[in-house]
Amino acid sequence: MIKNIGVDQIEVDRIAKVVDRGDGFARKVLTDREFAQYQDLTHKRKIEYLGGRFAIKEAFSKAWGTGIGQAVSFEDVETLRTESGAPVTTSRIFTGRIFSSIAHDDHEIVAVVVLEEPAGWRRAIGKLSHLLSGRKK
């Protein structure tokens, strides 16, 4: 069952400016493993990668319902690139499945995150509650 959906977009020019200033923003936003992937990229790909990861984290926090802050930090969400280049997003605060997508052109980067609740335990609790509610005391 879908818990929620989050979307974020950011201008490429904004990310390009922070990439041009050095690694400070990247170190703040990216996990250690994301930063390791980031370091191996060309300048143009660094902009796309950092912007995409920032947008994914923002989209996740919106789907979580809080935004980035006390409830969700940049470290709580990690999106790594598979060998095929597809993003795989995980979180240390959410145990369900996370579906993510990043799109970019020369001007904007957009990310979408869908959170899917772990179905097994919810379904089991629902069935158990239904069975117990029909019992005589």
Swiss-Prot record:
Pfam families: ACPS. Mg(2+) binds at D8, E58. Its cofactor is Mg(2+). InterPro entries: 4-PPantetheinyl_Trfase_dom, 4-PPantetheinyl_Trfase_dom_sf, ACPS, Ppantetheine-prot_Trfase_dom. Keywords: Cytoplasm, Fatty acid biosynthesis, Fatty acid metabolism, Lipid biosynthesis, Lipid metabolism, Magnesium, Metal-binding, Transferase. Its main location: cytoplasm. One of its GO terms (molecular function) is magnesium ion binding. It is found in: Cytoplasm. It catalyses: apo-[ACP] + CoA = holo-[ACP] + adenosine 3',5'-bisphosphate + H(+). One of its GO terms (biological process) is fatty acid biosynthetic process. Its EC number is 2.7.8.7. One of its GO terms (cellular component) is cytoplasm. Belongs to the P-Pant transferase superfamily. AcpS family. Transfers the 4'-phosphopantetheine moiety from coenzyme A to a Ser of acyl-carrier-protein. This is Holo-[acyl-carrier-protein] synthase. It comes from Lactobacillus delbrueckii subsp. bulgaricus (strain ATCC BAA-365 / Lb-18).
